């Protein structure tokens, strides 16, 4: 069959869409307005044992506090807790790609800030309220392609008891889909490994340290101290699929009849695949050719996947007696399929405030090329020897 349908024509045409002042002003008028959830509901409402386990598996985090109820019952939480960045399954990092009214502009997630107030415990029911945040623009070519528009989305999360669990702010870059020729990444070489390379990576993976049940006391932490790394990779499409299973189908992964109905309602959300079939823009995470059209030389990781890796790093370091108060992870470079990432951190400051023993951490990730692909920061609270 070679007949071109109207939907295919629309999908092909939209690849050339560009940002307009009308689009930008329309989005600015929505700042502070709650985002409609009808087309993109929460993937998880109740964090039962399956949901907690699946998110931990999806991020490659083996911490028993997410899996083992007998172990978790002995911690200060008294039960299993969900990985902190599981809030992505409630719409964080998702909705702006489908509800921000800029059809034809690619949405590239840049990072999220989280303010965590309390853990999500086994069987907690969490509801999210998401609102449009501020928008900034920058004329001229971005480091990826075309006009640069940075959008934000704010989230608030409440449990079944009416208690505030967390707040978030997403950052998403919107730009013309065709601009690959301007990319600074066009000469970035793909990773190729030999047996010795893989053995060295495996050895680094095995060096991962989880504090676990042994308290890390605030008094014992020193400014300038580096926290033990964790290694993610070499990244495979399987890793991305595993995370997607945990994160949820939305915004675009809607199979068969459900996908057909969404495409009929939102044809401009699709572009034709190499076989002429309208398909979702999320293909940039497994299809090299589509990634190239936005200026990235190969398929690459999911942004929320990478942010969640840092939740794994931080929980390893603070242990069962600590808590992540604030986490800010920003993506600086793409992590291509095949890349290996070393996630690290360093103590920048320690202080006491409002009865909490606080530590500020600088965060980053480097790949096998020694590129810094990710930067960030975190504030964590730790127990004090004076309190034990």
Residue map of PLM features:
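Hot-dog-fold acyl-thioester-processing enzymes
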Residues: 2-111, 176-321, 385-388
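Catalytic-pocket segment enriched in acidic/His residues
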Residues: 135, 284-285, 290-292, 297-301, ...
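HotDog/MaoC-like acyl-thioester-processing domains
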Residues: 2-33, 111, 116-223, 229, ...
């Amino acid at each position: 069959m070679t007949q071109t349908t109207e939907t295919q024509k629309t999908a092909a045409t939209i690849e050339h869409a560009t940002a307009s002042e009308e689009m930008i002003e329309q989005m600015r008028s929505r700042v502070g307005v709650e985002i409609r959830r009808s087309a993109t509901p929460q993937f998880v409402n109740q964090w039962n044992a399956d949901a907690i386990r699946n998110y931990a598996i999806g991020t490659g985090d083996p911490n028993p506090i997410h899996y083992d109820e007998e172990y978790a019952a002995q911690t200060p939480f008294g039960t299993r807790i969900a990985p902190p960045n599981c809030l992505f399954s409630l719409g964080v990092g998702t909705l702006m790609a489908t509800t921000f009214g800029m059809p034809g502009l690619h949405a590239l997630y840049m990072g999220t800030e989280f303010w965590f107030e309390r853990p999500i415990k086994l069987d907690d029911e969490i509801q999210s309220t998401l609102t449009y945040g501020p928008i900034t623009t920058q004329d001229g070519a971005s480091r990826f392609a075309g006009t640069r528009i940075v959008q934000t989305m704010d989230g608030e999360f409440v449990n079944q008891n009416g208690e505030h669990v967390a707040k978030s702010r997403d950052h998403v870059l919107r730009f013309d889909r065709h601009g690959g020729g301007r990319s600074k990444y066009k000469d970035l070489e793909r990773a190729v490994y030999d047996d010795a390379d893989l053995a060295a990576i495996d050895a680094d993976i095995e060096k991962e340290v989880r504090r676990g049940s042994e308290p890390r006391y605030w008094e014992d932490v020193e400014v300038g101290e580096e926290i033990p790394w964790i290694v993610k990779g070499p990244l495979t499409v399987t890793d991305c699929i595993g995370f997607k299973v945990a994160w949820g189908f939305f915004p675009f992964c809607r199979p068969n009849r459900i996908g057909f109905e969404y495409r009929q309602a939102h044809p401009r959300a699709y572009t034709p695949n190499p076989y002429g079939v309208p398909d979702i823009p999320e293909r940039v995470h497994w299809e090299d050719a589509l990634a190239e059209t936005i200026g990235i030389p190969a398929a690459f990781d999911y942004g929320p996947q990478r942010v969640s890796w840092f939740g794994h790093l931080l929980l390893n370091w603070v242990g069962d007696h600590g808590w992540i108060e604030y986490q800010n992870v920003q993506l600086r470079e793409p992590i291509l399929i095949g890349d290996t990432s070393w996630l690290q951190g360093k103590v920048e400051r320690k202080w006491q405030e409002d009865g909490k023993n606080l530590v500020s951490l600088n965060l980053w990730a480097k790949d096998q090329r020694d590129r810094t692909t990710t930067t960030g920061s975190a504030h964590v609270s730790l127990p004090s020897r004076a309190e034990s």
